[in-house]
Amino acid sequence: KASLLVWTTTPWTLVSNTAIAVHPEVEYVAMEVTHEETTEVLVVAQNLMDAVKGEKKILKSFLGKELERITYKRPFDYIEIPDAHFVVLATYVTTEDGTGLVHQAPAFGADDLAVCRSYGLPVVNPIAPDGHFLADVPVVGGVFFKDADKALVKELKASGALYKHQQYEHTYPHCWRCHTALMYYAQPSWYIRTTSIKDALLRENAATDWHPETIKEGRYGDWLNNNIDWALSRNRYWGTPLPIWRCENKHEICVDSLKELGTLAGQELSNLDPHRPFVDDITFACAECSQTMTRVPEVIDCWYDSGAMPFAQWGYPHKEGSVEKFKAS
């Protein structure tokens, strides 16, 4: 029996612990540690073992990749997370500090999300959009996420799962207006599948004569090489409304124009201001189930407006002759 010595700077995310990440090519050790009359076996990155107090005896050394998919007991079982809690591999894990084993909560970090998705792990989020734990979560239900740290550390100590707790100074995002702590928060979004044309984008970039030439393989080329699907939607009030209507049965339709919207709604809408709140008042019957269709609440990323404006102001691509006018040479 051994314990994975895992570190985190965000105890509040431990409620959502889904996996433990190790670097596949880093050397790890299982060592017997005796400290204050207690002996236990700990797993830690070899070049970080000096941070562990007590008499140490290495029992075995191995690469991180040998730990892959080994299961473990999570620190809290407050919420259900099915088919999870095993060791995963991640090249972003470092041995500059910590223990070389990193706690994964995919709802609260881009790296965690990408790694856990690659293993088919679920994204479970026990925190509401207002930053408070859901009321039915034991111990910290209804508590603001950062205020939950102390209570959770206390629970870790009581259960014997806490190895060490200390103050650790590090950067953390805060609201620039009110200085409230912020969180990375995974939520459903609408995407443009830009990855489906990634090869074509790279091919056209290679055939483009850039000035200065360094942009071709530098800033722009690097951006194309690291292209991911574009999260188009934004949860704001101001902006171009996402033109998607949905009914209670999840049927959806993307409306192309005010003319089409007027036809669907049976109204003359040529003079409608196509922004919130006015466009949100337009509803119509679903063609598949007759339920009422309402517009989804999201607006579009303003960069979409910026990119479309030079062409859309001249009626592209709907106005006759506009496609030929903007044909690339």
Feature map (PLM): residue ranges:
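Short, ligand-facing micro-motifs at secondary-structure edges
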Residues: 80-88
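Residue patterns forming the tRNA-binding/recognition surfaces of aminoacyl-tRNA synthetases
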Residues: 1-15, 27, 35-37, 66-69, ...
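Alpha-helical recognition segments enriched in aromatics with Gly/Pro capping
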Residues: 119-131, 236-238, 255-256, 260-329
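Generic recognition of flexible, low-complexity loop/linker segments
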Residues: 17-18, 58-61, 89-91, 111-113, ...
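Phosphate-backbone binding and catalysis cores of DNA-processing enzymes
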Residues: 20-24
